[in-house]
Amino acid sequence: MIQSSLYRALNKGFDYQILACKDFKESELAKEVISYFKPNIKAVLFPELRAKKNDDLRSFFEEFLQLLGGLREFYQALENKQETIIIAPISALLHPLPKKELLESFKITLLEKYNLKDLKDKLFYYGYEILDLVEVEGEASFRGDIVDIYIPNSKAYRLSFFDAECESIKELDPATQMSLKEDLLEIEIPPTLFSLDEPSYKDLKTKVEQSPLNSFSKDLTSFGLWFLGEKANDLLGVYQSIISPRALEEIQELASLNELDDERFKFLKVLENAQGYEDLEIHVHALEGFIALHSNRKITLLAPNKTILDNSISVLDAGNMECVIAPFVLNFKTPDRIFISLNSFERKKKRQKSKLALNELNAGEWVVHDDYGVGVFSQLIQHSVLGSKRDFLEIAYLGEDKLLLPVENLHLIARYVVQSDSVPVKDRLGKGSFLKLKAKVRAKLLEIAGKIIELAAERNLILGKKMDTHLAELEIFKSHAGFEYTSDQEKAIAEISRDLSSHRVMDRLLSGDVGFGKTEVAMHAIFCAFLNGFQSALVVPTTLLAHQHFETLKARFENFGVKVARLDRYIKTSEKSKLLKAVELGLVDVLIGTHAILGTKFKNLGLMVVDEEHKFGVKQKEALKELSKSVHFLSMSATPIPRTLNMALSQIKGISSLKTPPTDRKPSRTFLKEKNDELLKEIIYRELRRNGQIFYIHNHIASISKVKTKLEDLIPKLKIAILHSQINANESEEIMLEFAKGNYQVLLCTSIVESGIHLPNANTIIIDNAQNFGLADLHQLRGRVGRGKKEGFCYFLIEDQKSLNEQALKRLLALEKNSYLGSGESIAYHDLEIRGGGNLLGQDQSGHIKNIGYALYTRMLEDAIYELSGGKKRLEKSVEIQLGVSAFLNPELIASDSLRLDLYRRLSLCENVDEVGQIHEEIEDRFGKMDDLSAQFLQIITLKILANQLGILKLSNFNQNITLTYSDEKKESLKAPSKDDNDILETLLKHLHAQISLKRR
């Protein structure tokens, strides 16, 4: 009732500076009322901050930054004598917040002089994290005379200094690390946390460090807020405040759980509800009927544009109607007026770049070389070759063997990520065994790719059942989803509709993480088939998935007359024969089931949807192929497909990918804690209080029963199920089914349950001994919770903080602070590496993947598909550079090894000269003017690309004499003006460019 009550209060006289609401949704609705009816009042919206006193705020970092930004806006408006109000979820107002003096900003102005050391110190005391690379809010970096700053709740900027003078201020794109062209005159820099100087910073730091709080990072980011003392205010006590009835209920509930003392809220004025004032929820299809019923009141209809207005309603000229083109969301009625909005809230998605650098090469990690196999990357090292200095990667192989890989050939190696249950073994140099293994894998891949292409060609000749995909009922079906489709879902639906309405049978793969909306897309296709008079089959590998899909489809199709039935091992024999008869007679529209479906006779089957096809056995797959030969075929998979493989596969089948999480899905809240009994009880009770379920990951079968006993001692009557690899498949499925039904509260398992299973009620995951898991493992585990509308909680538990090395601690802290969802393909890709992804194409290849590594395997598979389908084959970049030229990215220009390594990798992957030019621009933008050694390395990369295009295998020189060796063993000689590095490179570049020009003619 927030909108109608607030509208009434505004009309009676309203002089409050804070409105406390139940949650963010209610706050958003309240802000719309104030912004529309009182545009002169500055309304500042706070986020939710569901942190309890003394919680580690790293887990709430993004919301905390937004809250501080909103508070600073409020203080500035007050200072400017502007009428202003904070509209906030009650959770953001429960704790004292910083006074104005702690949120002061400072300015940097073009052409003014600054001491860079003082600036660095100031940013540090203001809470900025000083790093090599600026990627997310609250970070800064100093590289010589170039300073990057990412201001919280704002943008990133790049400042260039010359002799202490600020020479340029430009906006920075953190995704590309490039600055934008336009120069700015000035920027204002607020604190990330608090505007402190050295003494006040040290004072607060001491208070935090001496506190008894349990955390891995006792710093100001984690706990500074709780120790501000007199420098913080209870906003509700200081400013005129009013609270919504639902916010008051929230406070009373928290008080009943002993989570806060409600005494201090009793003095607050409560926003009154009144008779005749009511918030509305009207569906667009019921709009005209509603308007006709209320002809006695003045109705204001708001819409984003005239087109939507005209398409939504035909009675715009009624005497009591007023139409307003405005973006506000207002839906309420009063005794004499009604406001209805055709607008919806736009969720501003931040373009988050994952801070979890999963593709980064780190010393000590396993790598696989295209020709020499599996080894360990030891270090980035400089060596003298032919009297010139060059950078190399040192890779350790079996025995004491070492390979020095020139950095321009970094494309020849990839990270070798093994599944958690296997131990990698180094290859031996010089035996040629790895090349033999590769040849074996290639032969198998050509066979697999051949079968796929043959099947695709066969299907392409079959005429499909053409369907009308533009029916009005499909739009009505979409509008009843109860949520907005993501752009990826819209695109996938359009692609499937195009297939269904063509004359060919559809063969499409729909891939996307669990909870990203694959089933909704499939249901749209099933409903389309139903409207066109066809039956559909949904085939799944497990009874649990059949049960889940049956419940989902039954509920979704309830109001649309679609008859849904299920066939699995739980259906009684007597019922089964009746069901099969009904399917044959066409009395069932959608049949859902396991492989039991495969022998079923349908009256008019038009669409077959298969979920997690790669989990079926060989015989079942053959039966699937037979049944689906002449019908539209949609395969769904939660296994992510790397982008390049996706491109190769799209030559032979349709591929749709869902990469965007639903708009209302939040990232899981992550906590890193030292394990103790009290903490375990608190975590479990917190989830049970909201009637949820818990995953408890304990990756050791031998001691899993002891963990169960301990949990039962801590919380008697706790219903716990155990699941691990030694329990047989049927029993495992039984346990999962019982857990999905809610008959267990905790699932105690060695690793997480199957990826394709959606368990929206399990929203807390506890990971025992988190230090023993890899980064991508942990991110994948965390992604298993928070998939419904409830927020997910993830706890990384460590037995003993002192036993952690610095690297492990850094890795875990990075995960705690960065909860971004689906942080790009790198997570999906590594997820696949961890899970094996062995039967991505329907035949188990996990043995081959284990031997040669996932990256090399997918690259070889792409090549096999291109080769057999007549596509463009990848150019091999195997030019050998034996030039006596010093060329490397100079550490004086780029001090960080990891940044240099990243640039080396990207340069080695360049396919054309333009890409090298772009990286050249980027280096100068990020690090300053390029020196000769660095520029010469980029020229070496350019030479490699040109030589590759001309079929040259080797470039070498002796003094000023240069030799070019071609693939047909032909040799060509050139003479440079001198043996200077510059002359050698210039002579070669000039000659190769001329050769390319001749070739193009």
From Swiss-Prot:
GO biological process, alphabetically ordered: DNA recombination; DNA replication initiation; double-strand break repair; regulation of DNA-templated transcription; transcription-coupled nucleotide-excision repair, DNA damage recognition
Pfam families xrefs: CarD_TRCF_RID, DEAD, Helicase_C, TRCF, UvrB_inter
Enzyme class: hydrolase
DEEH box, short sequence motif: residues: 611-614
GO cellular component: cytoplasm
Residues the entry annotates as binding ATP: G512, D513, V514, G515, F516, G517, K518, T519
Residue ranges of domain Helicase C-terminal in the record: 679-835
Function comment: Couples transcription and DNA repair by recognizing RNA polymerase (RNAP) stalled at DNA lesions. Mediates ATP-dependent release of RNAP and its truncated transcript from the DNA, and recruitment of nucleotide excision repair machinery to the damaged site.
Designated name of the protein: Transcription-repair-coupling factor
UniProt organism field: Helicobacter pylori (strain J99 / ATCC 700824)
